[in-house]
């Protein structure tokens, strides 16, 4: 009898994971809120389990409900997709504590990479080039002090920010108060902490990321680069693979840096290492420890199914 996998998500990524699971002969269990009962992922799955409650907090972000659904439907593993609980260390830990396989990085990896200051320190310790950056602080007085050390222009960032949120630029000292207020307020409202830090701003940088995959033992490979420099409000609009207009030295340097960091972290499953690139120089930016929205761009170019590789590694 085929094993069952619960997909703790909805929409496009749930359908994507279900397709990969079916191609490997796994049985898929979808979860859904009442509003999503007729959604495509529910129709595609072999079984579906309704999550009671209203809104994401009571359904797709409810750790206990997701694990209970997996146990009730006799699943052996949970794939989180992206968004919702995908990068929550406490969710990955709860899944493993329930004797289920978490199809993603280890809890400790998620905890580290979820903190931008801690992940930058890890990158620095691994020998990667990093941008000038302060420690965390929670007052404007400290912000002024750290900004003067770093110089303008700069970003004021929440260590837990993402998707362009919790991040605001100050071109000069007169803009620092506004940048601090916005970044710290968004951090408090979205992530429960008003702590922020300041980071060097590279005005003409390109945004290039490296797709990596690890087996959990320290063996990591790269699956090329993606260019995502075309953005609106610091959110990606267009992805291109592989990134163009890179000399061999820079491209190889990006690959090697990504592998070095993720090997140090003993990456399990898929993760993307993001860099800022200016000319032939590059700097570590952050790690996205999950399958990303844009992963099919890499799959089309390299002829690999990244979700199936996640399944092979986890199971």
Language-model regions, residue ranges each:
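ATP-binding N-terminal substructure of ATP-dependent carboxylate-amine bond-forming enzymes
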Residues: 1-126, 138-145
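ATP-dependent carboxylate activation and anion-phosphoryl transfer catalytic cores
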Residues: 6-24, 28, 47-50, 71-73, ...
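Conserved beta3 strand of the protein kinase N-lobe
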Residues: 133-134
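Acidic/histidine-enriched active-site and ligand-binding environments that engage anionic O-linkages
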Residues: 145-156
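A short acidic, helix-capping loop that chelates divalent metal ions and anchors anionic groups
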Residues: 164-166
């Amino acid at each position: 009898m085929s094993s069952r996998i619960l997909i703790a998500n909805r929409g496009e990524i749930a359908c994507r994971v279900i397709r990969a699971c079916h191609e490997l002969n796994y049985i898929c269990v979808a979860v859904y809120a009442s509003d999503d009962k007729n959604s495509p992922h529910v129709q595609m799955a072999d079984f579906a389990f309704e999550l009671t409650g209203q809104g994401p907090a009571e359904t797709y972000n409810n750790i206990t409900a997701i694990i209970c659904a997996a146990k009730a439907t006799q699943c052996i593993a949970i794939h989180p997709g992206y968004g919702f609980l995908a990068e929550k260390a406490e969710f990955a830990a709860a899944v493993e504590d329930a004797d289920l396989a978490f199809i993603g990085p280890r809890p400790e990896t998620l905890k580290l990479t979820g903190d931008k200051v801690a992940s930058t320190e890890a990158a620095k310790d691994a020998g990667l080039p990093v941008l000038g950056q302060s420690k965390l602080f929670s007052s404007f007085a400290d912000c002024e002090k750290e900004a003067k050390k770093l110089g303008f222009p700069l970003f004021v960032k929440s260590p837990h920010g993402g998707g362009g949120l919790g991040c605001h630029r100050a071109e000069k000292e007169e803009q620092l108060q506004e940048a601090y207020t916005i970044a710290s307020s968004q951090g408090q409202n979205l992530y429960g902490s008003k702590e922020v830090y300041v980071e060097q701003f590279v005005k003409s940088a390109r945004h290039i990321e490296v797709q990596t995959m690890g087996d959990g033992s320290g063996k990591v490979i790269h699956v090329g680069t993606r260019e995502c420099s075309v953005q609106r409000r610091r959110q990606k609009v267009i992805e291109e693979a592989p990134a163009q207009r890179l000399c061999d030295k820079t491209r190889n340097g990006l690959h090697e840096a990504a592998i070095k960091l993720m090997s140090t972290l003993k990456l399990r499953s898929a993760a993307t290492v993001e860099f800022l690139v200016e000319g032939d120089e590059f700097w570590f930016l952050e790690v996205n420890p999950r399958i990303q929205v844009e992963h099919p761009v890499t799959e089309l170019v390299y002829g690999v199914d990244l979700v199936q590789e996640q399944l092979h590694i986890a199971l």
